[in-house]
UniProtKB/Swiss-Prot annotation:
InterPro entries: Aldolase_TIM, His_biosynth, HisA_bact_arch, Isoase_HisA-like, Isoase_HisA-like_bact, RibuloseP-bd_barrel. Keywords: Amino-acid biosynthesis, Cytoplasm, Histidine biosynthesis, Isomerase. This is 1-(5-phosphoribosyl)-5-[(5-phosphoribosylamino)methylideneamino] imidazole-4-carboxamide isomerase. HAMAP family: HisA. It is an enzyme of class 5 (isomerase). It is found in: Cytoplasm. GO terms for molecular function: 1-(5-phosphoribosyl)-5-[(5-phosphoribosylamino)methylideneamino]imidazole-4-carboxamide isomerase activity.
């Protein structure tokens, strides 16, 4: 299971939201490309970027920062936020982005996802953001009546790289993940799953290890890293397969 550090962009800055609320945002001082480079030096194997401005409006405004990150690091980058056309995807690929995340567009235009996953197999990720099990779109500003599990079933026949599933109620809280939600997704798909939302300690990471053999490929972490709850080096050390037996999964490490 891989730890994937997150960079959420607003107005060219690194920010974090609380439960997806744009009015509850916290800005961080490092420039996005500096933050990405630091995490690469800590041992990150991939960087997760979300363009929050684009997610909200559909119009990309952080491309300068995105390009700079892509030029600064030598590890794969996956990016989401306002990606709603083939033209936008190809533009991001031209910047050096490895994979793109389709969220709102996946729900509103499933044929586009199917076509693009056929054209770019293994490079399209479907992002599913859910609140109380139901999907939210457009930067989490709109709530649907569609169950996340129904979408996962539908997209599991596509040639996508993975699902990223976010539990909005835990995102930015540092209070732990929604294990039942994660489990419900893993039970219905053979496609790799990346979980997001709620990780606040090493113990939270360890609690997800049991899902690794069920298809949990990685976990996205943002606020906990920014606020120094633990480091990527510490997490990688703990999550390395040869070290897991050293830890009591019921004990609270670095809480």
């Amino acid at each position: 299971m891989n730890l994937i550090p997150a960079i959420d962009l607003m107005n060219g800055k690194c920010v974090r939201l609380f439960k997806g609320d744009f009015n509850k945002r916290k800005d961080f001082t490092k420039e996005p490309h500096e933050q990405a480079k630091f995490w690469e030096s800590e041992g990150a194997k991939c960087i997760h970027i979300v363009d929050l401005d684009a997610a909200k409006t559909g119009s990309p405004t952080n491309d300068k920062s995105i390009k700079k990150i892509a030029k600064t690091v030598n590890i794969p980058i996956q990016i989401g936020g306002g990606i709603r056309s083939q033209e936008r995807i190809e533009q991001l690929f031209s910047y050096g982005i490895e994979k793109v995340i389709m969220g709102t567009s996946a729900i509103e235009n499933k044929e586009l996802v199917k076509d693009l996953s056929n054209k770019y197999p293994g490079r399209i990720i479907v992002g599913i953001d859910a609140k109380n099990g139901k999907v939210s779109t457009r930067g989490w500003l709109e709530q649907s009546n569609i169950f996340a599990t129904d979408l996962v079933k539908e997209f599991s026949s596509f040639k996508i790289a993975s699902f990223i599933v976010t539990d909005i109620n835990t995102d930015g809280t540092l209070e732990g993940t929604n294990e039942e939600f994660i489990k419900s997704i893993l039970e219905i798909t053979d496609i790799p799953v990346i979980a997001s939302g709620g990780v606040g300690s090493i113990s939270d990471l360890l609690s997800l290890v049991k899902f690794e053999n069920s298809g949990l490929f990685g976990v996205i972490v943002g606020k906990a890293l920014y606020e120094n709850k633990f480091t990527i080096k510490e997490a990688n050390n703990v999550l390395s397969s040869e070290r897991l037996n050293d830890f009591d999964l019921n004990r609270n490490y670095y809480a």
